[in-house]
Every structure is written in structure tokens, then in C-alpha cells.
Amino acid sequence: MVKEKEKPKNEIIIETENLSLFYTDFKALNEINIKILKNSITALIGPSGCGKSTFLRTLNRMNDLVEGIKIEGNVIYEGKNIYSNNFDILELRRKIGMVFQTPNPFLMSIYDNISYGPKIHGTKDKKKLDEIVEQSLKKSALWDEVKDKLNTNALSLSGGQQQRLCIARTLAIEPNVILMDEPTSALDPISTGKIEELIINLKESYTIIIVTHNMQQAGRISDKTAFFLNGCIEEESPTDELFFNPKNTKTEEYISGKFG
């Protein structure tokens, strides 16, 4: 049972200003302007190839790993442009974490999956690591299922458990924002329901931006939805408003299934 959505805080944590992205000569994102509120869930929807996943990756500079990328415009996180020359990218990716479409646990124990990030960032004390592992697994609603087998290989978990483990691994390094790229697309309905409930619970402490092809999912969990088409945001508004009273003809056609 997914609990009722609470209103987000009226405080901007991320803002993009005329953000464009080029793959060599191809313009994949075209002057994106959007404000993300703290402790909110923002859903990004649109047909395949519309730019929503590309946009998501600009928010913690994951696109830097792709050759031939050029960025124009700004991404402001907590008042600073993350594309400025002196911005600490490692710290950025700690504060803005990422959960991918396919669960990708490391080939190591459940415990080591969670403790890996904190160790990299300097936490060595075993008692502190134990605490981080337990709290991260509790926040991801996985602790009760794995507390007696923390030394078991993470790949022994089910797909849904692996995805919650990946969320726990992200939480372990204390992010402020969690980016999710279709985190339930490879999961069965029961596992999907657990992840959705988890996402809503996480909103109390984190800001979440999620790419989803599932419009029903966007309706169930998000506060605001942005509809992407051809590298642009065609429309963004509170989720209920966008789905039940869209202002843009293309939005209405997409959510009614006329294309996509």
C-alpha cells in the first residue's frame, strides 16, 4: 500500500538555466529550464529518445564520461553551478547519487556493497561502518530480509532486493538528491510496489528525480512531472494537473497513448 504523498518544501535545491547538451553536432537537450524543490519527487516522462535520461545525467555530470559531449547553460545545485571549473565532481556525485535501470550490485557481500562508499570517503571505524550498513538497509526497507546474511554475496538476492540494495548503497554516502533512471522497469509488480513505497518514504529526507516510462507510476509517486519531447520540456506542472488537465496538445496526446 503506497502512502499518500506529502507536499514538498518550498525550497529550490536544483535549478537548470538554459541547459543544452550536444553529442558532437546533435543537440540532445535544448535550453532546459526547471526548478527542483527540496524533499520533492519529480518524474520525467516522454517517449524513448526524448532526452529525459540524458537530462538526468547532467545533474551529477555523469555525461562527462561520454566522449564528444558539450554543455551550454547552468545547473545550479545549492546555489553553485556544478559545471564551473573548480567544482568538486567527486563530492557532487556523493551529494547527488544515482540508481540505474538494472540493479548493479558489486560482486561482493551485502555488507561490503554498503560499506564500500563510506570506506572510499574515509570512514574506517568498524563500529561506524556497522551502523551505516544497518541504517542504510533499514532506510531501504531491506534490513529485516538480509540482517542474518550480511556476508552473503549480493548477487544471491532477488532482482527487487538487489535494487533496494543499490538504493541502500547510495544512501550510505549521505546524498541530498537521488537520481533514478527507470529503477523498476526490470522488476515484477510486487517488487515495483515495494520500490514505489520506498521512494515516497525517502522523500522525507531526500530529493528524488525519477525517469519513468510508466505514467501510472509517475501519477502514484511524484509531486511534479515534466514531459520531455525532442530534447525540450514541453510541459511541467504538479503531477495531478499535468495528467488530468494538460495545457499542451502534445502532452495530452502522449498521456492518452496517441504516440510514444
Swiss-Prot record:
CDD domains: ABC_PstB_phosphate_transporter. It is a peripheral membrane protein. ATP binds at residues 46-53. Its main location: membrane. It is found in: Cell inner membrane. PANTHER family: ABC TRANSPORTER I FAMILY MEMBER 17 (PTHR43423:SF1). Part of the ABC transporter complex PstSACB involved in phosphate import. Responsible for energy coupling to the transport system. This is Phosphate import ATP-binding protein PstB. It comes from Borrelia garinii subsp. bavariensis (strain ATCC BAA-2496 / DSM 23469 / PBi). The lineage of its organism: Bacteria, Pseudomonadati, Spirochaetota, Spirochaetia, Spirochaetales.
